[in-house]
Each structure stands twice: as structure tokens, then as C-alpha cells.
Amino acid sequence: MPHQPSIALIGTLDTKGDEIAYVRERLAELGTRPLVIDSGILGEPGTSADVPRAQVAREGGHELDRIQAAGSRGAAVELMAEGVRAVCVRLWLEGRLDGVLCLGGAEGALLGAAAMHALPVGVPKLIVSPSASGRRAFGPFVGESDVLVLHSVVDILGLNPIARAVFDNAAAAVAGMAREAGSAVAGLAGTSVGITMLGHTTPAVMRIRAALERAGHEPVIFHANGVGGPAMEGLAAAGALSGVVDYTLSELANSLLDGLHATGPERLRVAGAHGLPQVIVPGCVDFFNQGAPETLPAEYRARRSYYHNPVATLVRLEPDEMADLGRVVAERLNEARGPVRVLAPSLGFSLADVEGGDLWYPEADAAFLEALGDGLRSDIPFELVDTHVNDPAFADLVAERYLALVAEPTSTT
């Protein structure tokens, strides 16, 4: 008998009862087993739930009446999100969850997203929301995971021809994914190596990827755009990577200057905290990301900059900022419990950081390299190589150093 996928269907049943009931029927007609999880807080549920809201609250460590008295809508949503997350993780661990579908407005979508972010990459995840549109930020919905977001076109209030068409497609999408999905990424993936990259380090990373593949490793490339680096580190923490070549650290530069690709304070800490072998290259530390040239803040207009595309400008860090960044990189690497090697090119960190290039500023690069070298623990090897970050010979050296590092006996610091 073919496997019948189980789909967690998340919604606030006090406001979305009819819509959840409709999608539950569609999922059942499509041959799946829907499990309705009530993420509602205040009103009375409009349909039945497999996991009622009181149980959801308790699985998150709270009583429903406490959440209802939280004092603000935001605080209540945060507390209920803990329960929704706990329920879905439990179902996944019990082998009773093959996909997740959430219907909701802004808060309802965030409640579903909280659960989806806790599940491994490869588990089908779909949010249907009117908030998935316009200029709204999608980061809170997608996070660092593989969440699909579908605009509902109409608000999720009542059943009408447009709503039914969208809901039918959503049910078919998650049912199809759950039936045909590949394996979820959970557990150590043998010799998978996480590598960070941007367009300005692509030539080198392509060469490193080829070298590691020839040696029997499986490179996994992450776009270091404010999400890619944390996504790589999240997978490292989950045991899905066996090592890291962090070749592109521009997210740290963005965090220092509040650029568009900024990340949180855990960047460059996670892999080391889990003892994974790391080879670090400061690719793209010379710039931070801003929007279209005409939108640059006044304080940046006199700086060196690179016109990347009509909606992206790369702005050069000044020497004092580069020195600060070098110290940040050193401090975070010094926390590592696993083996680390640092290789740094002395003749430029990006395609535009070359003699005659728009971002060429050797004094600034020197300030970074000096601060990095001075700040690293004495037992972390630091190689300063007289070349550019995209030099083929440098890329080959980085690949060699990684292969040598993972061949060494495992040790933690």
C-alpha cells in the first residue's frame, strides 16, 4: 500500500475555521492525512482540531489562559509560536509529519513559520497569506529555511471562487511535494562541505568546488547575502555539514555598517562552536551592500563604490572600519572549539578590489589584515598570501588546506 503522507495544517481556528476546514477536505481528497493544529488564541474555534489550542499552548510550556492574558498581541503570538513549533517538531520526530501547510494573515503566517523554521530542509513547507505581497519583508516568513510563500490574492476570510482556487492549488502543491519529496536533510551528510560565495568570489569558489569534488567531497554553496551564511551555519549546527570553507565574509562587513546583507551576532561562531573544521578566507570584506546608487545615504556618497546592478551598490569600508572588522573576525574565530585555518590574500578581496578597480584601497586592506593577524589566537594558523582572492593558485591552496585539515586527527580546543 502506498505511503499516505501526513500534512500538518496550521491555522487560527477562531478566525480561519471555515478556510482550514475546506483545505482539510481538499488534502484528504488528495490522498493525504491532514492533522489540524489550532494556533488560535482568543475566540472560539470554528472547526475541530487534531491538536487543540490548549494542547498547543501546553506543549510550548504555557497555559492558554496565560497566553490570553499576555498583555499584547505580539507577546501572545510569541508564546503561542513556541507551542506550534513544539508540536510540529514532535510530530516530525515521531514520523507523523511529511509536510506543513499554514493559512494566515501576518500573525497567523508567523505562527506557522515558527514551526517551519524548526524543521529540516527538505520537509515541504508552504505558507498562504495576503501578507506575501508588495514591499513587505519576506525574511520573517522564509527565515533561513526552504519555506514556500503563496500570495492568497484575497484576504483569508470566507470562501469564494478566488480563495478556493488559491487553496486548491496550495493543497495540491503540499500534497504533491509530500508524496514526491526527497529525503529531509537531518544528520551528518558524510563529506558535505559548506562554502560561502558571492559574485565577487565566484571564480575562486568554482575552482575550489571542483577540487573538493575530485577529492570525493560534496560542496554545498551558500550565497552570502545575509541569509546564506546563517543558513550554512544552521545546517552545520544540525549536523548536515562535515566542514566549512567560509570564503566570503561580507555579511560581517554589512553587520558592522548596517548594510542590506547584515546578519545576527552568531555569524562566524556557529560552526566553530560545534567543533567543525573550518578554513576561513576574508572574501568580500572590502564592501557592504546598499541599494540603488541614487538611494545612497549622503554620508556614503563620497566613498569609493561599485555599481553592481540597478538596485545594488557596493560601498567601500574605510581603514578604521576595516581594522574593526579584522578584530571582529579574529574574536569570533578565537571562540572555535574545532580546527581552524585562516588564509588571506594581500592583493584584494573582491573582483573590484584590484589595482585600478573601483574598490581598490590597499591601505584599508592592510588595516584589516594587521588587525586580523594580531587578534587571532596563536594556535590558529594564519597565512598571508601575496595574491588576489580570485587567483586560481590561491583557490587551489585553500582547497589543499581544507583537505589537509579534515585529514588530521579530530581534536577540539
For the regions a language model picked out, list residue spans one by one:
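Glycine-rich phosphate/diphosphate-binding loop of Rossmann-like nucleotide-binding domains
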Residues: 16-26, 35-51, 188-226, 230, ...
